[in-house]
């Protein structure tokens, strides 16, 4: 009896897809020793137009929902003549795909190699399916060697969730396959990843890069003191990449001082993957334009906004075959600028302003939690754990002291005065010494 054998369904050599045509483009860049990061804008936009049209053809042929929406919008062929015409393509809203694993799937289910899903904290989760080629072929085509300086001599500690969502596995693939680094799969405080073991592993293998969330970077630094591990001696990082949560520039400065290294921001999502990342200038996020096309729209009128105008971030993925996201409304707020960065990169610069659903109304103004955190972190006596509590128009701050000689009452008075100067309203302040730490996303706003 002949033994049954199994063959991997996807390989770089054998796989066929609408995306194969872009291999030659990126291979030519590699041969010329350049990356998409510094291409002239016209060449970037020419590539993006071709990639978008290839994606439109793919979803037209492979997905009933996408095709019906394009036809309703007046498309008779799945093609646009310029990037300006992308506005004719319908938006993809979260509620349409929430809880529906098939809605925008563009491959046969047996061709799926990986499934991720969002946390579902605001409703049913969003499922995102990938083919193996999505993950190990097309996602690795664009190189960003100016934004990521890591090489095979680096050891990257990935302290992000490996369960359900994309971040842990996504960063592991990025660093292993794109840069050849060793990876320490720390996870984020789960059953098999207690903090003490994570710190010990970083010490033993001399991690040079840490990828994690802002709150977990603070927790690791805090716990290192409790476990007798000295940052700067036992663990000597050269860089931290923050993702998964937003944070203020002041919070980032605190982490840089604590860890003694550069800290940069990375913006992405389980649905869309990589979107944008900071360069060494730290003046905004460069959009990773080999992977995505980003637009800014007015969330009410849905009109596209020009450079410099703040609105909702809309993302179109360019190198996906299993489940492309076309004009996906992220729910995040920001604005775009043409790159005039001293780093020399030509990719557009994105400035994030938080999530629409998290904006806080105080008096007559709307505030991003990042801005309020920035104001609070301007007080050096305040620790990195806090809550903003909102209740029927009242605003209360719960904060921890940090290496201060002030009494709790003195610190509360100092916070009240500083925040009143910053936002123009009075707030209640409670000094606590027991704000809970979390291994999940930090809860900063309580309503």
Please give the residue ranges for each predicted region.
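Nucleotide 5′-phosphate-binding alpha/beta core
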Residues: 1-117, 123-137, 144, 204, ...
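Active-site phosphate/ATP/adenylate-binding loop shared across adenylate-forming ligases
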Residues: 2-34, 94-236, 246-254, 258
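Core-facing hydrophobic residues within beta-strands of well-ordered domains
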Residues: 56, 237, 382-383
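Residue-level signal for inorganic ion chemistry
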Residues: 59, 118, 210, 255, ...
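General small-molecule cofactor/ligand-binding pocket signal
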Residues: 184-187, 264-266, 428-432
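AMP-binding/adenylate-forming catalytic core of the ANL superfamily
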Residues: 210, 314-425, 440
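Conserved AMP-binding/adenylate-forming
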Residues: 238, 247, 251-340, 357
């Amino acid at each position: 009896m002949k033994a049954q054998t199994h063959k991997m369904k996807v390989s770089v050599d054998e796989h066929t897809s609408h995306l194969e045509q872009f291999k030659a483009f990126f291979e030519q860049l590699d041969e010329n020793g350049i990356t998409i990061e510094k291409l002239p804008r016209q060449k970037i936009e020419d590539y993006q137009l071709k990639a978008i049209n290839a994606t439109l053809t793919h979803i037209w042929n492979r997905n009933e929902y996408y095709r019906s929406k394009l036809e309703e919008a007046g498309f008779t062929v799945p093609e646009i003549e310029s990037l300006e015409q992308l506005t004719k393509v319908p938006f993809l809203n979260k509620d349409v795909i929430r809880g529906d694993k098939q809605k925008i799937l563009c491959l046969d289910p047996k061709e799926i190699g990986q499934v991720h899903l969002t946390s579902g904290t605001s409703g049913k989760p969003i499922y995102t399916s990938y083919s193996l080629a999505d993950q190990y072929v097309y996602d690795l085509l664009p190189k960003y060697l100016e934004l990521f300086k890591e090489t095979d001599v680096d050891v990257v500690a990935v302290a992000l969730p490996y369960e359900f969502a994309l971040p842990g596995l996504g960063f592991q693939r990025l660093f292993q396959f794109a840069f050849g680094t060793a990876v320490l799969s720390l996870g984020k405080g789960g059953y098999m990843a207690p903090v003490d073991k994570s710190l010990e592993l970083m010490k033993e293998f001399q991690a040079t890069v840490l990828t994690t969330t802002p709150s977990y970077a603070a927790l690791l630094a805090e716990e290192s003191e409790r476990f007798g591990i000295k940052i700067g001696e036992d663990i000597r990082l050269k860089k931290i990449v923050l993702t998964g949560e937003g944070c203020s520039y002041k919070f980032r400065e605190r982490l840089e001082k604590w860890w003694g290294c550069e800290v940069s921001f990375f913006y992405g999502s389980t649905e869309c993957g990589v979107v944008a990342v900071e360069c060494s200038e730290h003046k905004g996020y460069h959009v990773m334009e080999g992977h995505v096309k980003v637009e800014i729209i007015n969330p009410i009128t849905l009109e596209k906004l020009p450079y410099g105008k703040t609105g909702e971030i809309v993302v179109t993925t360019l190198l996906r075959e299993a489940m492309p996201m076309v004009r996906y409304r992220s729910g995040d707020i920001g604005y775009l600028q043409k790159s005039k960065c001293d780093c020399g990169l030509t990719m557009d610069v994105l400035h994030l302003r938080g999530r629409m659903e998290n904006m806080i109304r105080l008096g007559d103004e709307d505030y991003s939690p990042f801005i309020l955190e920035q104001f609070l972190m301007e007080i050096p006596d305040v620790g990195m754990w806090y809550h903003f509590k909102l209740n029927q128009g009242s605003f209360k701050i719960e904060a921890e002291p940090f290496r201060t000689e002030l009494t709790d009452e003195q610190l509360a008075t100092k916070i009240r005065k500083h925040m009143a100067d910053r936002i123009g309203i009075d707030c209640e302040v409670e000094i606590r010494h027991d704000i809970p730490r979390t291994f999940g996303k930090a809860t900063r706003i309580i309503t």
